[in-house]
Amino acid sequence: MSERRNTVVELLGENDVSRTVARIAHQIIEKTALDSEGADRVMLLGIPSGGVPLAERLAAKIEEFSGVRVDTGAIDITLYRDDLRNKPHRALQPTSIPSGGIDKTTVVLVDDVLFSGRTVRAALDALRDLGRPNYIQLAVLVDRGHRQLPIRADYVGKNLPTARAEDVTVMLREIDGRDAVTLTREEGEGDN
């Protein structure tokens, strides 16, 4: 019988995560024309749990780089998930939408990892119940591939092609006490 063990590799460290967030903030400024008059009102809505602190960080960087303060909030997708039958006991997360709502705005959904696309699909369904933005965009720190739905991020910090069996973990100082992105793979004796 072969012994299985997990190997954890740090792919992004503290400085890498910081640079990546700054780069995404610059891209949002450019694509949404935030620094020009007449641009849509832009808001960043984080998908709990990792997307919420990322949205706050992006908003701070956008303000630092452009002088424009964008609204932030959180959108709970729990009741919109398509796996509720498999995992029925999920804690509801708070939804907080900036005053004025989402109608006629550019909403940038923010999440830490894009994988199957199902979380984003649930967020799109939740948004539909809250109003009608002019545009919906997606910003993710990590895109690891393996989509099950036709969903693509507008802003990607790092593309990390992975095997389906590998796990990508995003650690954020607001939640985990430090910033890092790690890859965990299970290996057994004789694996190379």
UniProtKB/Swiss-Prot annotation:
Reactions the enzyme catalyzes: UMP + diphosphate = 5-phospho-alpha-D-ribose 1-diphosphate + uracil
Assigned EC number: 2.4.2.9
GO molecular function, one term: uracil phosphoribosyltransferase activity
Keywords in alphabetical order: Glycosyltransferase, Transcription, Transcription regulation, Transferase
Cross-referenced InterPro entries: PRibTrfase_dom, PRTase-like, PyrR, PyrR_bifunctional
Source superkingdom: Bacteria
CDD domains named in the record: PRTases_typeI (cd06223)
HAMAP family (alphabetical): PyrR
Protein purpose: Regulates the transcription of the pyrimidine nucleotide (pyr) operon in response to exogenous pyrimidines. Also displays a weak uracil phosphoribosyltransferase activity which is not physiologically significant.
Family affiliation: Belongs to the purine/pyrimidine phosphoribosyltransferase family. PyrR subfamily.
Name listed for the protein in its UniProt record: Bifunctional protein PyrR
Organism: Corynebacterium efficiens (strain DSM 44549 / YS-314 / AJ 12310 / JCM 11189 / NBRC 100395)
Organism lineage string: Bacteria, Bacillati, Actinomycetota, Actinomycetes, Mycobacteriales
